[in-house]
Regions:
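Catalytic nucleophile-elbow at a beta strand-turn-alpha helix junction centered on a G-D-S/GDSL motif
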Residues: 18-30, 55-58
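PAPS-dependent sulfotransferase catalytic domain
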Residues: 4-7, 36-53, 57-202
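Extended, structured, electrostatic nucleic-acid-contact surfaces
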Residues: 4-17
């Protein structure tokens, strides 16, 4: 299913969020300026497409942390045990991670939206404000705070504290992540090597 994204039909511009918290933030900022949310696969071949890209491993962990928050909320009488059980389940069956709503490949998300042979302008996740300026021509100083892991419940924060079993090298599931999201890594590594703030991908 095509993920929702934002378009401005007057400027023929589209912005593709690649994470749930980024999606909420972009909707908050752009809907005030006449942008609309759509799931139309190809609104127009003459749109200019923008997105931000995140380190695939950091994005995976961020998505799993949000999933763990739901586990926590549903098991308040046994939070540590429930969180540990979920981590063990993912460790033993990594493919179950792929079926989660927010772990879809960034590449797959974009290729499902951007028309064939159309260019996508990609910024690093840390440059989301620069991407917004490029897409809108406006500075946005009213962006809401993005979700940060420090705000999560203690049992989830503890999993990723320095020295835990999940933060030791090699990082938990990092090899599987690189294999499963290899195309995401290809784009991310091109961004890291670029001498410009953004790169252009063609699908």
């Amino acid at each position: 299913m095509t993920q929702s994204y934002l378009i401005n039909t007057q400027t023929k511009t589209a912005v593709i969020p690649i994470m749930r918290n980024a999606s909420s933030m972009l909707e908050f900022v752009l809907k005030k300026d006449g942008w609309v949310i759509t799931k139309d696969r190809y609104p127009s071949a003459d749109f200019t497409y923008y997105t931000v890209w995140r380190d695939p491993y950091e994005r995976l962990i961020s998505a799993l942390q949000r999933e763990l928050c739901e586990v926590y909320d549903q098991n308040l009488h046994r939070t540590h045990a429930a969180v540990d059980a979920q981590m063990n389940e993912w460790s033993n069956d990594p493919q179950s991670i792929v079926d989660l709503n927010h772990t879809i490949s960034q590449y797959d998300t974009c290729i499902d939206i951007v028309p064939q042979n159309k260019k996508l302008i990609v910024y690093p996740y840390a440059q989301i404000s620069s991407m917004l300026f490029a897409a809108t021509g406006k500075l946005h100083n009213d962006t809401p705070k993005m979700n940060v892991s420090a705000d999560y419940p203690p049992p989830i924060v503890e999993l990723w504290q320095e020295g835990s079993v999940y933060t030791r090298e090699p990082l938990w599931m990092s090899g599987w992540c690189r294999k499963e999201f290899s195309k995401d890594y290809d784009v991310w590594e091109r961004l890291l090597k670029a001498d410009t703030l953004s790169i252009i991908e063609t699908y």
